[in-house]
Amino acid sequence: MSEQSICQARAAVMVYDDANKKWVPAGGSTGFSRVHIYHHTGNNTFRVVGRKIQDHQVVINCAIPKGLKYNQATQTFHQWRDARQVYGLNFGSKEDANVFASAMMHALEVLNSQETGPTLPRQNSQLPAQVQNGPSQEELEIQRRQLQEQQRQKELERERLERERMERERLERERLERERLERERLEQEQLERERQERERQERLERQERLERQERLERQERLDRERQERQERERLERLERERQERERQEQLEREQLEWERERRISSAAAPASVETPLNSVLGDSSASEPGLQAASQPAETPSQQGIVLGPLAPPPPPPLPPGPAQASVALPPPPGPPPPPPLPSTGPPPPPPPPPLPNQVPPPPPPPPAPPLPASGFFLASMSEDNRPLTGLAAAIAGAKLRKVSRMEDTSFPSGGNAIGVNSASSKTDTGRGNGPLPLGGSGLMEEMSALLARRRRIAEKGSTIETEQKEDKGEDSEPVTSKASSTSTPEPTRKPWERTNTMNGSKSPVISRRDSPRKNQIVFDNRSYDSLHRPKSTPLSQPSANGVQTEGLDYDRLKQDILDEMRKELTKLKEELIDAIRQELSKSNTA
């Protein structure tokens, strides 16, 4: 190659813009370029060529003319101009500027020396050759090579420094990148820890909130269950109280109904007795053996009032006494006497007549013992005024009654005197304001005895009293007819306690039960103490004209029917209680 590079430098090539009065980068883009000074050995010319380091774009290519003015404006910025424009080189270092400036000076010296050299031979062609002053061509070549070598070394050193700088920059960038990554990692870890801590706190708070809410709900549920249980217990207690109150009211209503019927039956009892008395007292001239014969079957009704049935509890309805109960051997405590009877339809009995002149007036008998009821169910209807004697008091009263009867038997052997004594005793007993109603037993016997004595006295007085007696018999005939019809034709469709006794509109079976024994008690009342207490083991076996045995069978059936009804009611009540308990249990289970 005819051209050789005598120098290279790293510099930014600039061109001066005359229009804008400023330096602009050559090639339109900034950046360093490799600037060489080439020497054409054949022509002995020099030129400056610059290429971009990045894309090898030629940014400068100008010849170095002879007489060029090279201006070193600063240590790193040199400039020159040719006929077209002004060039400037902004070197990267002082070494590059010095190397390029030395090569430029050497090129200018060569060009200047070449201009003066040929002219001298032409001018002095006739003169001998002279010794050239200055370095020879070989020396210049050696210097040029040395400069190139230095330039090359500097270039290598510069490249090495550039590589080191770039390596340092790369390491610095990597370090910064690592630091950035480490910092980001730490920040990420910190954020992650904070997030986890926040989530843990939120989870703990949520769990605590849920636990607190569950505790509150459990407490509310327990409170609600306790309130419901208390409310249920209160409702059950109110329901039990209501049922108890209704049961008590039902019992009171039944007791009042039974009491009302008993009062009606007790009030109708004297009217039902008048007719059998008329039939018994129709023949006033009855003989003494006839009375003795009638005393035998009348002993059982007299014991009926003394031997009592067992005392039953107040809730069930009372069982009416019958002949079957009269033969019970165990005497229970006596019940309360019934209230005084309502006035009967017949005329009131007249006062007892004065004693006859040929008779010794009997001593006043003591008040008889209160009559014993045939059943213990009268206990619920007794009052404070007519409370009966029980226990030892009843036994003492019975003993007094026996003593008086014995005295009457010894002092007054005649039947008329006994009748008078019994009449006075009956008057004394019935005249008491708080005396019990004679329903059965000795009280019923005393009532019958009083009626018999009154009939006897009326028969002894004369015809005027006999007319009154006939009127009384006429008035008493109607109840006998109604009673006979009711006893002879019982209603098969009704139960025994529902059969209607048409006398005075009452429906009590007590009146019809007592009619037959009273007829026998009237005849039996005049007998002695021994005949009163004669033991009888069996009731009447022969059916009488009044139908005693038939009534006994009716009242046995009545007793059985009442027991059956009581069992049915108790079973029904038990089922209702069981159903109510089941309903409450089902409510509590569903709640």
UniProtKB/Swiss-Prot annotation:
Modified residues (Phosphoserine): 125, 265, 506, 508
Locations listed in the record: Cytoplasm; Cytoplasm, Cytoskeleton; Cell projection, Lamellipodium; Cell projection, Filopodium
Chain ranges of the WH1 domain: 1-111
SMART domains the UniProt entry points to: WH1
Location of the region described as EVH2 block C in the Swiss-Prot/TrEMBL record: 554-588
Residue span of region Disordered: 115-146, 221-379, 405-549
Ranges of biased composition (kind: Pro residues): 311-323, 330-373
SUPFAM superfamilies: PH domain-like, Vasodilator-stimulated phosphoprotein, VASP, tetramerisation domain
UniProt repeat feature Sequence, residue ranges: 156-160, 161-165, 166-170, 171-175, 176-180, 181-185, 186-190, 191-195, 196-200
Protein keywords: Actin-binding, Cell junction, Cell projection, Coiled coil, Cytoplasm, Cytoskeleton, Phosphoprotein, Repeat, SH3-binding, Synapse
Ranges in a coiled coil: 135-265, 557-587
Tissue expression remark: Expressed in myoepithelia of parotid, breast, bronchial glands and sweat glands. Expressed in colon-rectum muscolaris mucosae epithelium, pancreas acinar ductal epithelium, endometrium epithelium, prostate fibromuscolar stroma and placenta vascular media. Overexpressed in a majority of breast cancer cell lines and primary breast tumor lesions.
Residue ranges of the region described as EVH2: 391-588
Pfam family for this entry, one: WH1
Region annotation 9 X 5 AA tandem repeats of [LMQ]-E-[QR]-E-[QR]: where it falls in the sequence: 156-200
Family: Belongs to the Ena/VASP family.
Function of the molecule: Ena/VASP proteins are actin-associated proteins involved in a range of processes dependent on cytoskeleton remodeling and cell polarity such as axon guidance and lamellipodial and filopodial dynamics in migrating cells. ENAH induces the formation of F-actin rich outgrowths in fibroblasts. Acts synergistically with BAIAP2-alpha and downstream of NTN1 to promote filipodia formation.
Protein's name according to its UniProt entry: Protein enabled homolog
Organism: Homo sapiens (Human)
